[in-house]
Amino acid sequence: MRRLFLLLLCLALVGGCARQPSVQEPEPEPIPAVREEAEPPSFSPERYVPPPWKGSEPQQGAPIVPQPGDTAACWDMARAGDFAPDDDCSDGELLAKWLAVEGLTLSDLEDRGCTQLVLTVAREEDGVSTLTTCYVMEDNAWHAQPGLTRMAGYTGSNGIAHDRRRNTRQSPAGLWALGSAFGLASQPAGLLLPWRDITPQSDWVCDAASPYFNTWQERDDPLITQLWDLQDAEHLEDYSVTYRYACVIEYNTPPYTVPDRGCAIFLHCSDHPTSGCIGLLEEDMVRTLLWLDPRENPYILITGHEKPR
């Protein structure tokens, strides 16, 4: 009996265990499908759009005199004696020297919002050959731009003058804004300055009696062509080498035009003295153009030694 009782007890226990709900382990979460890394969103860097080309607006009303940057009243060559000869100056010393000679300070550049400066110095040997160095304001200090220092070039064939007059073949000393670029060659890739192609109709008006004096005009515009003497204009296409690449120096341009001070003063290609412009070898001219940025409000300081008389 005892054995029978134990057997029945075991069967009851086994049956009871079988009826107990089994403890289920949680189902594993599904493994997400392996996906390739998504491409980063494509974007284009903000495209820089140069400002409009300037140089065709006529003088309105009486000219503003003197033009800002005219250093005729404040320059003093004696100040050069406080510095070493140019060839012995560092690039920084060279800038300090010729700012001082022109009666200018770094504050004069700051006041103009200028953070790019082209310094052209007429050399003592002849007053006609030049050295040109480009400077940029970075970290609250002026630095010479590598690769754009002591570039050889030329002034007008009669050197520089602080009270420049027309037909003197002199370059205007002083601090002048650099404006738009133009040329007979193709626009350099990467240029930031506004650019204008020279056409067979392009004139730079030199007629002192014209309201368009010292501006670019197209002679095929019948509405205005009669407003200047076609014989008293630079027909830009005729300057096949000089104007391959050029940049307007804003000397005596509207609203400052005084006709007897002259016109058509540019930074352009040249391997010899000019009629009054500042010349650089073409390779240096192109590299300088590509460096210039209108957002930096670039200026040129034309200074140095006058041509020996």
Regions found by a protein language model. Give the residues of each.
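Positively charged n-region of N-terminal signal peptides that target proteins for export
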Residues: M1-L4
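Extended catalytic/binding region for NAD+/ADP-ribose chemistry, centered on the ART fold
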Residues: G276-L280
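Cell wall/extracellular polymer interaction/catalysis modules
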Residues: D70, C74-T274, M285-R309
